[in-house]
A protein has these predicted regions:
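Walker A/P-loop
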Residues: 3-4
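Charged, low-complexity C-terminal accessory regions
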Residues: 7, 155-183
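Conserved substrate/cofactor phosphate-moiety recognition/catalytic segment
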Residues: 8, 12-51
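Anionic group-transfer/hydrolysis microenvironments
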Residues: 22, 71, 118-120
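Short aromatic-enriched loop/helix-cap "lid" or pocket-rim segments at secondary-structure transitions
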Residues: 29-32, 78-81, 126-128
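Glycine-rich phosphate-binding loop used to anchor ATP phosphates in small-molecule kinases
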Residues: 43-109
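A glycine- and Lys/Arg-enriched "phosphate-lid" helix/loop adjacent to the NTP-binding pocket
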Residues: 82-168
Length: 183
């Protein structure tokens, strides 16, 4: 759907801090694939992403706008989905511990706005994703998990759905962000 590219481009466009998906660097450095991840890996993802986002939000370079590539709700979504897949190493018991940590971190976060990309089109293989979960059915199931968690955590009222092509989504976020800056 182009989430990471969108976040990077928005950060550069507004000269604002933006985060990357911390888990991807962790996985590259650890030489571990999605299906090999266990509970300790997901706890590291949660803490690593939270700390990265927090450091960028609190950075002296932040003039009030920050774009996050990922957070605890996204990590929890993947963990829940992977824990239900017998081809993945993550167990339902490990997921229960991940869920507690993810929910604690979600409560600490106070997002002003959350943009959610809905699944559409063909998933582009970036050679860093578990392609067994890249079909439209799987991506829609992941989206529904995220949506349910956004509702359950009280964050759904902050959500704007991005369902256009890349440029339409970019312009939608730019328009919203300019409105915030002009206040």
């Amino acid at each position: 759907e182009g989430k990471s590219t969108l976040v990077t481009d928005l950060g550069k466009y507004f000269n604002a801090p933006y985060s990357y998906e911390w888990a991807r660097d962790y996985m590259r450095e650890s030489c571990v694939s999605d299906w090999e991840l266990d509970g300790a890996d997901y706890i590291a993802f949660l803490e690593g992403q939270y700390n990265l986002n927090k450091s960028l939000i609190n950075s002296p370079a932040n003039n009030g706008i920050f774009f996050a590539d990922s957070d605890s709700m996204v990590t929890k979504m993947y963990a829940k989905y992977y824990s239900q897949d017998p081809s993945c190493d993550l167990t339902p018991e490990e997921y229960e511990k991940i869920e507690v940590t993810a929910d604690e971190l979600t409560r600490k976060c106070r997002w002003d706005k959350i943009f959610v990309l809905v699944p559409h089109g063909v998933f582009v293989d970036d050679h860093e994703r578990y392609m067994a979960h890249s079909g439209m059915k799987e991506r829609q199931e992941l989206y529904e998990l995220l949506k349910a968690d956004l509702i359950r955590s009280g964050n759904w009222d902050k959500v704007t759905i991005l369902d256009g092509d890349y440029y339409e989504n970019f312009l939608k976020v730019v328009e919203y962000t300019k409105g915030i800056i002009e206040r």
